[in-house]
């Protein structure tokens, strides 16, 4: 394995020998199953679900992460690229609407090779479900292989990105990444049943005390890609955990006023997409890391 430069950390570590900035070495996953917690156009509402593969490791260091065991601690099971391809085809056989690759950035080169080899047998869309901290050069490896990009756009403020994710360059990196994603997929396309066929769906988790930054995120997004060409998902599922409990703003849940301020602003800007109910702010969106399907 060459020195790793897949993510913006550019750690240049030989991940065949030691862990990189992403906290993992080889290809590791923690679960592969039909998943029903994504947006309706991804998971569906007919009981089929998204064919979700949760990868271990992450290039971001978000202090409020609810998936810490796999994102930071590297919990997971090592598999071969060949097995990854088999898992994708098995999920298709189970009736998945799509293949949903969660936190795939640090395996992008492997994923590109796997998708190239199985694409003739894979007849459902492939979703690249990521944190938005992506290098354009890495995304270009996937051009023509990914049907749906599902990135986060977490922050507009470099200061917030530094404090909460140890990534002050996050805003500038995410903007370029989302522009590249849109270049690859073009305007959102849907199947007759409303499921997403192609395009970009941008997620934003509204954080307590950060509603003005959330509005700035929407401003930047509108200036980056056509509002009518994408979908957005404004999430209110923030639940304090881990080190976030030690930070004043992050030690509480989001208020209805804060969330509605952001959703109202998104509507003013003309965005189309998804919102969440207050009851979503629980840990029930966090799966059990039981190696199912691996």
Annotate the PLM regions:
Residues 1-19, 186-294:
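Auxiliary Fe-S-binding modules of radical SAM enzymes
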Residues 23-144, 148, 157-159:
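Conserved Radical SAM active-site core
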Residues 51, 99, 126-128, 149-151, ...:
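Hydrophobic faces of well-ordered beta-strands that scaffold small-molecule active sites
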Residues 71, 108, 132-135, 153-171, ...:
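Conserved radical SAM core fold
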Residues 79, 106, 165-173, 209, ...:
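Alpha-helix N-cap and loop-to-helix initiation/capping positions
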Residues 114-125, 176-184, 256-264:
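Alpha-helix-loop-beta-strand connector modules within alpha/beta enzyme cores
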Residues 143-158, 230-238:
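Non-cysteine beta-strand/loop elements that form the S-adenosyl-L-methionine
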Residues 162-193:
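Anionic-ligand binding region
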